[in-house]
Amino acid sequence: MKPAPLANFLIPHSFARNLAESRWGRGGTSSDHTTRHGVFYFSCSGHGGYVVDAGALTPEERTEVEKIVTAEPIRILVQGDAVIGISNPFTHTRGIKYKTHLGPPEWQVHPVYLFEEDCDWAVLEHVTGIRTSWAKGREDKDPEAFVADLERRFEELVAAKRRREVDAIPQ
């Protein structure tokens, strides 16, 4: 990859796709546009969902999202103020070039969120207003029905999370 400024680094589409395929199955993967840069949607062979660079969310959105979904720590290779590599979930890391005169490169953790299509997607859409082009079309066609369905799915997700937390309490 070309060096990218660390200050405004967002994972590229190709890496987001690899991350999605490592989680939801490789082969036959398709993607849909979303309403925000740094947010990707993939449908993979086994499942699918949103892959979201934490840098694409505001601090307030991250706080709300993290009440329900935990970020996945990926590793980026940083040299000076530039990202020069990303640890790939399939190939791991290889072929990264760096310039010794810029100082030693170091691995840093970079948070990425995965919102599975069957459940967690409602968290992202409810908290942020981010949509796929398909969902945006549904919302534009009938905003009231779309919002009502989204709210219902979000509440179901929160209720299920609470039940799991209660079930995990030792008796």
Report each predicted region and the residues it spans.
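Short amphipathic alpha-helical segments that mediate assembly, nucleic-acid/protein binding
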Residues: 3-6, 61-62, 143
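Extracellular structured ligand-interaction cores
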Residues: 47, 112, 121
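A short, exposed loop/beta-hairpin motif centered on an aromatic-Gly-Thr core
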Residues: 107-116
